[in-house]
Swiss-Prot record:
Originating organism: Escherichia coli (strain K12)
EC annotation from Swiss-Prot or TrEMBL: 4.2.3.5
Binding sites annotated in the UniProt record for FMN: R125, S126, S127, N238, A239, G278, K293, P294, T295, S296, S297, R319
Family of this protein: Belongs to the chorismate synthase family.
Gene name of this polypeptide: aroC
A Pfam family of this chain: Chorismate_synt
UniProt protein name: Chorismate synthase
Cofactors required: FMNH2
Top EC class for this record: lyase
Lineage summary: Bacteria, Pseudomonadati, Pseudomonadota, Gammaproteobacteria, Enterobacterales
Length: 361
């Protein structure tokens, strides 16, 4: 199975399945001498961790990360960093009834078509459980970017179902179980989630992630454009069906005179481009959005087939998130951090001596 690695100079390779013994990853390219402890990684893992509120899956995994290699006496050595998280709360018996049944909307059918077999326990490798390791690796990148370059990466929920959420107050994001920046909408989200739980259904969501302090010049035209790599990274997250950079699909309705980000001696006058022009960072905030589908793991009966081609009715058992977009916030932050760190290292490797007299803001 290929496709388990992302990045060139900062490389992250993950392994493990939802109901396997453990999840793990190898992180290559971390410069030596960076202070790093397991506590540095645990904060973001706790934000993603299941079972932390009544609005997410009640699978209770502590997600305690272990650093196996690449760190000595509290600092990185420059060698590969090995990370491990043990699975402790598997209930594989919940999935015995779907051993021969393809859950509609899941990867069951496509995995078996590709590999001729599948791990039916919680989706195996296709499960979002895998993203725990991305968050751990991303925490390394976030720490490096923040401490060495002052780059801050933040994410939040900006829509759930038909409820739009304005970014009114970033300080509120960590104060509620929805990662919601709009405190006036908390009650509406709570009401929606209660209704979904009662109905046994699920809902989609939109997540926004923002990087501030990113220097101009990151990105490698033409096939490794910064926005292309960000889109690639975010699209690789489970349930993501669309990614926008800046104004995204809204630019369809704009005219060139409206969409262009005009420049004065005081800097850019707008940021429709989301901080990326020609595939290269402009020095403005990088803004990306991703749309997540409603999970198909619901108790509403649906039609499907089994591996023998027979039509059957399907009701998903097990413990699942009614809105996967909630816990996707720290995952999106991690993936953006991984991409930015990779491109920052690539920029330093090729263009460390480049100096210009062009203004920067």
């Amino acid at each position: 199975m290929a496709g388990n690695t992302i990045g060139q100079l900062f490389r992250v390779t993950t392994f493990g399945e939802s109901h396997g013994l453990a999840l793990g990853c190898i992180v290559d390219g971390v410069p030596p001498g960076i202070p790093l402890t397991e506590a540095d990684l645990q904060h973001d893992l706790d934000r993603r961790r299941p079972g932390t509120s009544r609005y997410t899956t009640q699978r209770r995994e502590p997600d305690q990360v272990k650093i196996l290699s690449g760190v000595f006496e509290g600092v990185t050595t420059g060698t590969s960093i090995g990370l491990l998280i043990e699975n402790t709360d598997q209930r594989s018996q919940d999935y015995s009834a779907i051993k021969d049944v393809f859950r509609p909307g899941h990867a069951d059918y496509t995995y078996e078509q590709k590999y001729g077999l599948r791990d039916y326990r919680g989706g195996g490798r296709s499960s979002a459980r895998e993203t725990a390791m991305r968050v751990a690796a991303g925490a390394i990148a976030k720490k490096y970017l923040a401490e060495k370059f002052g780059i801050e990466i933040r994410g939040c929920l900006t829509q759930m179902g038909d409820i739009p959420l304005d970014i009114k107050d970033w300080s509120q994001v960590e104060q509620n179980p929805f990662f919601c920046p709009d405190p006036d909408k908390i009650d509406a989200l709570d009401e929606l989630m209660r209704a979904l739980k009662k109905e046994g259904d699920s809902i989609g969501a939109k997540v926004t992630v923002v990087a501030s302090g990113v220097p101009a010049g990151l990105g490698e035209p033409v096939f490794d454009r910064l926005d292309a790599d960000i889109a690639h990274a975010l699209m690789s997250i489970n349930a993501v069906k669309g990614v926008e950079i800046g104004d995204g699909f809204d630019v369809v309705a704009l005219r060139g005179s409206q969409n262009r980000d005009e420049i004065t001696k005081d800097g850019f006058q707008s940021n429709h481009a989301g901080g990326i022009l020609g595939g290269i960072s402009s020095g403005q905030q990088i803004i990306a959005h991703m749309a997540l589908k409603p999970t198909s793991s619901i108790t509403v009966p649906g039609r499907t087939i089994n591996r023998f081609g027979e039509e059957v009715e399907m009701i998903t058992k097990g413990r699942h998130d009614p809105c996967v977009g909630i816990r996707a916030v720290p995952i999106a932050e991690a993936m953006l951090a991984i991409v930015l760190m990779d491109h920052l290292l690539r920029q330093r490797a090729q263009n460390a001596d480049v100096k210009t007299d062009i203004p920067r803001w």
